[in-house]
From Swiss-Prot:
TM segment ranges: 10-28, 38-56, 79-97, 108-126, 198-216, 229-247, 269-287
Superkingdom of source: Bacteria
Cytoplasmic face residues: 1-9, 57-78, 127-197, 248-268
Catalytic function, reaction form: heme b + (2E,6E)-farnesyl diphosphate + H2O = Fe(II)-heme o + diphosphate
Family classification: Belongs to the UbiA prenyltransferase family. Protoheme IX farnesyltransferase subfamily.
Subcellular location: Cell inner membrane
Encoding gene (name): cyoE
Protein name per the record: Protoheme IX farnesyltransferase
Length: 296
């Protein structure tokens, strides 16, 4: 029973979703030549770091989680794990994850993990989520870290491919998160969380969703245009982007915003999963200069 509670507080669904993107970034960089020990170290390391961040987030958010319907039954809210124990647990998970990335992958992968962790826990969870409408934007940067870590674990470089991955996954996070905020509007309102739909209105959020999907579509194409992914990837990327954009545009005419937002959210998962799979299997050897080469 206790195992289940310690697992739940790490948010397994979030860990699984991040692992899909880590695999995408790792295999994109591997170009068919997979270092399996490195692959395992990277996956487990990122999983532990994400788990640590989620436990810290649960600790920080336990007051507002009580006010939200979807989070009122979380482990810390119900007192099934004490706050003090959760902090120790989160710290141990983080230390283990960072050590695996440092020694099992490379220092760059570890530092990227540290930066993503600090942004998520220190900047987003502790401050931006509660005080700024731009919290979602800041949070999107940490959400985009896992595929970049997977990529850089192989290359040891933060090159243009890594930058494109950062752009793709950051831009994807925005409509994905705004969709959640729309169909969970009352929850965010009750907890006084200043997400865009609550502060500026759902109609403004729809405009932002549309613009971010357009930007996302452009970013996805850059993997092929930059020589990192092939044309099969390009076709899938274009198809999911056009479909997702079409869903966003239909949102201007719907009668039930919550139903529409839930569908948009659901397709966002399909879209990013499809892209992660395609970049894993349809890769090209790039011919581009590094933006930043990490020398160790």
């Amino acid at each position: 029973m206790m195992f289940k509670q310690y697992l739940q507080v790490t948010k397994p669904g979030i860990i699984f979703g991040n692992l899909i993107s880590v695999i995408g970034g790792f295999l994109l960089a591997s170009k068919g030549s997979i270092d399996y020990p490195l692959f395992i170290y990277t996956l487990v390391g990122v999983s532990l770091v994400v788990a640590s961040g989620c436990v810290f987030n649960n600790y920080i958010d336990r007051d507002i989680d009580r006010k939200m319907e979807r989070t009122k039954n979380r482990v810390l809210v119900k007192g099934l794990i004490s706050p003090g124990v959760s902090l120790v647990y989160a710290t141990l998970l983080g230390i283990a994850g960072f050590m695996l990335l440092w020694f099992g992958a490379n220092p760059l992968a570890c530092w990227l993990g540290v930066m993503g962790f600090v942004v998520y826990v220190g900047v987003y969870s502790l401050y931006m989520k509660r005080h700024s409408v731009y919290g979602t934007l800041i949070g999107s940067l940490s959400g985009a870290a896992p595929p970049v870590i997977g990529y850089c674990a192989v290359t040891g470089d933060f090159d243009s491919g890594a930058a494109i991955l950062l752009a793709i996954f950051s831009l994807w996070q925005m409509p994905h998160s705004y969709a959640i905020a729309i169909f969970r509007f009352k929850d965010y309102q009750a907890a006084n969380i200043p997400v865009l739909p609550v502060i500026k209105g759902i109609s403004v959020a729809k405009n932002h969703i549309t613009l971010y999907i357009i930007a996302f579509a452009v970013a996805t194409l850059m993997l092929t245009l930059g020589g990192y992914a092939g044309y099969k990837y390009l076709v899938v990327a274009a198809a999911v982007s056009v479909w997702w954009l079409g869903m966003a545009l239909r949102g201007y005419k719907v009668e039930d915003d919550k139903v529409w937002a839930r569908k948009l959210f659901g397709f966002s998962i399909i879209a990013i999963t499809a892209l992660s799979i395609m970049m894993s299997v349809d890769f090209m050897v790039p011919n581009s200069q590094n933006l930043l080469t990490y020398v160790w």
